[in-house]
Amino acid sequence: MKTEYKPYVDALIELAIREDIGDGDHTSLCCIPADERGRMRLLCKQEGIIAGIEIARLVLERLDPTVEFDQRIADGTRVRPGDVAFYVAGSLRSLLQAERILLNIMQRMSGVATQTAVYVKRLEGLHTKVLDTRKTTPGMRVLDKMAVKIGGGENHRMGLFDMVLLKDNHIDFAGGIRPAIAGVREYLAAKGKNIPIECEVRSLEDIDEVFAAGGVDRIMFDNFTPEMTRKAVEKVAGRCETESSGGITLETMRDYAECGVDFISVGALTHQIKSLDMSLKACE
């Protein structure tokens, strides 16, 4: 896990504990002795790319610092029904409290990683990279971004703070591409910030405007056809990175990649996923 992610992950775990356990797991408190210890296993029930084992361990350790965590496979492994990701031993009350929290996290992260791997596979043999977006569940973005990386994809910006991305609304409100880029450069210089600049374009003519304004780090081709994309890549001619976005599906993305774009951003990696089936069960 990246060092900068840890505070977000810790905060998410605390929130998950508050919303699920509240003032106590009364079911376990009333029928499980306080000193009772046991062992459970994380059983995979569906084929896919597993993700979130590292987070599951943090959840368990937060609820029981004495927990014994025996990991058997790594995040990013393709699992099949019957595979065991890890065994965990500790206070039974703590294990039962952690069960749903860690399953919710792992099932979603594994769903994102599995879906990402499908998109990455579609571009096999090409240099184009698959990017995620900011279309994530509020509060879950760090985990979604981690899962995309585990599935073989790449991360776009984390939020509004680590990259300037001039989209259509910014450009329209600023009065056009040239004044928008000029405003960005003036602002970043005044603030002493060194972050990448990306600009969305809606036509081939817009590309000329970007370079007339001094250029950017990356140009995003918004809702271009493959034919337009090929012409756009030729016009950019390697002067900056290129990205295709908008309306690109699993079925059409290779057509765009074959035009030579560096990146394709896909919102479906995180907002149209199916969680991977798994369970945490008692064992000897």
Which residues does each predicted region cover?
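Acidic/glycine-rich phosphate/pyrophosphate-binding loops and surrounding catalytic core
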Residues: 1-213, 218, 227-235, 241-243, ...
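Cys/His-rich Zn2+-binding cysteine-cluster or related metal-binding knuckle/ribbon modules and their
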Residues: 250
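Short secondary-structure boundary segments
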Residues: 222-223, 246, 268-269
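Short, charged, intrinsically disordered terminal tails
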Residues: 268-284
